[in-house]
Amino acid sequence: MVRFLEYMIQNISVELLRAVTGDGYPIISTRNEISTVPDLLQGRHEEFVLSPRIDTEMVAEACRAGCIPMAHKIGDFEFLMIKLHHFRSVLQFPDLHTPRKTRSRSRGLRIAVDRDFSRCLGAVRDHYPPSMRWLTPRLCTVLDELHGQPRSGVSTHSIEVYDGAGLVAGEIGYRIGAVYTSMSGFYLRSGSGTVQLVSLARILESSGFLFWDLGMDVAYKRTLGAKLFPRAQFLALYYRGTALSAGFPPGDLSCEELIRGSEVNR
C-alpha cells in the first residue's frame, strides 16, 4: 500500500511539473534515471532534464553523474533542474593565468574552506535578485544537509574570503573524489572575486585535485585559463577524477601568499 501511494504521488508530481513547464524538457522522477540524462539530451538544444524531486538522493546522484543540480520555484512549487552542458568550462592547473592587479588586491585577505557554510550560502543566494535565484529554499536545505552529512561521496563546501571578520567574496560548490565543481559565487569588493578564484585554484592544485570544474562558459573563466570540453570528453575526464582522492586543507590561508606562489611557479 505504501509503495502504491508513493507511486501515485510521484506520478502526480510529474504531471504537475509537465503542466507547469510544458513539453520542452525531459522529466525524470527516480535516482536510477539520472544515468540516462546524457541519452535524454542527445541531439537536443536543451541542457536541462527536470525532476519534481529535490532531495539529497537526487542531488547527490546528479552530481555523481557529472550534472550540476539547479532548481526553480513557481509559486510554492519547486523543481530540480539537472544541467548537463554541451560544453563544460574546465581549468587544468598548468593553464592558470593570474590577471594583473590580483596580487595587490589580495593584501590582507584570507581564504578559508567551510568556516561558515550557512553564512556563505546565504550570501551567494542573496547576491542575486529573486527572479534570478536558482538556489531555491529546498535546494539550499539539501546543500546544507550534504555539507553536514555527505552522501555517496558527494560533499558540499563553501569557499570564503575574509578581510578581518568581514566576508568579502565566496562561493559554494561540491567535491567528489579529486574533482571540485563550482556552483555559484559572489563578491562585495572590486577584485575580491578574482582573488578568491586564483587563491582557490592554488589550493586545489596543491591539495591534489585533478582539475577544477567551473561549469558554464563565462569570459572571466577563460581569462583565468579555463578551456571548454565537449560533453563526452568532459564526462570521461570527470569520471576519472571522481575515482581519485583529494581533500581541502584545514584553517585559513593568506591569499597574497597563494597568489605569489602562482606567479613564481609560472
Feature names for model-found ranges:
Residues M1-R266:
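N-acyltransferase acceptor-side catalytic subdomain
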